[in-house]
């Protein structure tokens, strides 16, 4: 997280939303977990920062950490996921490989704006 290195002496509460998300992810990685749980990492972020956060999440996964991602931005989540679950009122209504879910007409119509 090069951006955080530049701000290493800054109080966390004064960081931008994206920087705070990077800090939270970094703190979660400090114990070298096998599984990292992320709840809405894109919430409240500008689109450019959302893309950056998702690139970071993808890189963490590619380095061997399993990621459980809860995310309203279904397009972005499915673009980096291996597998996905679609929940409605707390129940799993669909699941499968992320590419299949992204191509599913029901999923497109209901969740992907298409």
Predicted regions mapped to residue ranges:
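Conserved ABC ATPase signature
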Residues: 11-15
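Catalytic Walker B motif of ABC-type/P-loop ATPase nucleotide-binding domains
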Residues: 36-40
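Helical segment within the ABC ATPase nucleotide-binding domain
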Residues: 51-63
